């Protein structure tokens, strides 16, 4: 079998590494769109012999199979705890491929009932030195009906029989008034439920006016109760912001338990500039303090960890947590898992470091299981066990 063009990350590091190492160069959004166009075509043609051969080579490079990394959570079998966060594959064009990149699960969206263009460009900015990004995308997507058609065209295996779990992240249409939000979410979810292993209620993006008001306990409860009345509802999780006060986090944990939610995803991007207030964007000449949008990546790491710890302390092990925000190494992944996250998601770190980040994390987790004498990754969740370094670490 010929080697994958992404073998050892050589392609990514040679061609994209120099582009991503500074804030200038190719537009960040255009780069993502170009990559997704190619991946979307590959997903539609993944049964073709040549495409299949390339994808199998890719899987050989990036997948790491180990029964110790498997978990069954809210009725879904996750082959490993590392997933692709929502926001990259907004329209689900590459849903049939993400397992080849080593992911145990992938989340498409955020999708809204009405297709919408999002906010004006430029709206996505690299902060290479800080390994971070600022975005104010505004839920740009083709809409729920288009997403269903896109997923059906890829002829995915039915839920429960896929090589990687598929989540669908649902948000509110910008044109929908806040008081009508439950019906807007319900329309999307009712249409997409047959295709989803799980669904996420996104009430935490900072880029849709008023959306974060839905994190208020009374508003969120009304929304959840409406969705749970659907004829067929997949396991529901809620994605929360890092900027919530601790009392609000506790309230969401209680609500999730009382309403029977499958879990909480923590966290979305932050309105806090996290010490980067005076960092100036080359594209606009303005500082981050002057710019709208949510911050992601390494600066978010500590707050994301604190939120996971708070949720774990509030809800205990009964509520599944998915950790996202600033995860760019096996050590950080282990820290998030031992703080209470059963699963983790990557986005900004994966963009900067490339596809090899997934196997590096998985190999690092395997080594930690060995060093701690654990039989499964589930035993590490919420354990508080430290990272044990060793000479053979996958991280070097």
From Swiss-Prot:
- Protein topology in the membrane: Peripheral membrane protein
Of the GO CC terms on this record, one is: plasma membrane
What is this protein's name? Dihydroorotate dehydrogenase (quinone)
Q: Which InterPro entries match?
A: Aldolase_TIM (IPR013785), DHO_dehydrogenase (IPR050074), Dihydroorotate_DH_2 (IPR005719), Dihydroorotate_DH_cat (IPR005720), Dihydroorotate_DH_CS (IPR001295)
**Residues engaged in binding substrate:** 90, 135-139, 202, 207, 268-269
Q: One Pfam annotation, family name?
A: DHO_dh
**Places the protein is found:** Cell membrane
């Amino acid at each position: 079998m010929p080697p994958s063009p992404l073998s050892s990350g050589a392609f990514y590091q040679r061609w994209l590494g120099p582009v991503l190492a500074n804030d200038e160069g190719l537009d960040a959004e255009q780069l993502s769109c170009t990559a997704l166009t190619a991946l979307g075509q590959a997903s539609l043609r993944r049964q073709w012999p040549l495409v299949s051969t390339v994808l199998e080579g890719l899987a050989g490079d990036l997948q790491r199979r180990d029964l110790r990394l498997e978990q069954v959570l809210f009725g879904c079998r996750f082959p490993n705890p590392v997933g692709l966060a929502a926001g990259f594959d907004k329209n689900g064009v590459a849903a049939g491929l993400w397992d080849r990149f080593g992911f145990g699960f992938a989340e498409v969206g955020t999708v809204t009932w009405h297709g919408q263009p999002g906010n004006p460009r430029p709206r996505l900015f690299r902060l290479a030195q800080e390994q971070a990004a600022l975005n104010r995308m505004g839920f740009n997507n083709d809409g729920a009906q288009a997403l269903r058609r896109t997923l059906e065209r890829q002829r995915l295996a039915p839920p429960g029989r896929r090589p990687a779990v598929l989540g669908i992240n649902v948000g509110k249409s910008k044109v929908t008034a806040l008081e009508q939000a439950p019906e807007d979410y319900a329309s999307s979810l009712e249409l997409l439920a047959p295709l989803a292993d799980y669904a996420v209620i996104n009430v935490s993006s900072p880029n849709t006016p008023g959306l974060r008001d839905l994190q208020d306990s009374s508003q969120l409860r009304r929304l959840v109760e409406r969705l749970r009345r659907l004829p067929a509802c997949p396991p529901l999780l809620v994605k929360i912001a890092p900027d919530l006060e601790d009392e609000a986090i506790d309230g969401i944990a209680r609500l999730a338990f009382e309403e029977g939610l499958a879990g909480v995803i923590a966290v979305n991007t932050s309105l806090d500039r996290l010490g980067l207030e005076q960092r100036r964007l080359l594209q606009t000449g303005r500082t981050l303090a002057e710019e709208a949008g949510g911050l992601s990546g390494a600066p978010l790491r500590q707050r994301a960890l604190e939120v996971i710890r708070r949720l774990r302390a509030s809800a205990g092990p009964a509520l599944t947590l998915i950790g996202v925000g600033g995860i760019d190494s096996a050590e950080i992944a282990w820290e998030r898992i031992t703080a209470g996250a059963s699963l983790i998601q990557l986005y900004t770190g994966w963009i900067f470091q490339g596809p090899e980040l997934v196997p590096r994390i998985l190999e690092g987790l395997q080594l930690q299981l060995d060093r701690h004498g654990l039989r499964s990754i589930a035993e590490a969740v919420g354990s508080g066990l430290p990272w044990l370094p060793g000479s053979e670490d996958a991280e070097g």
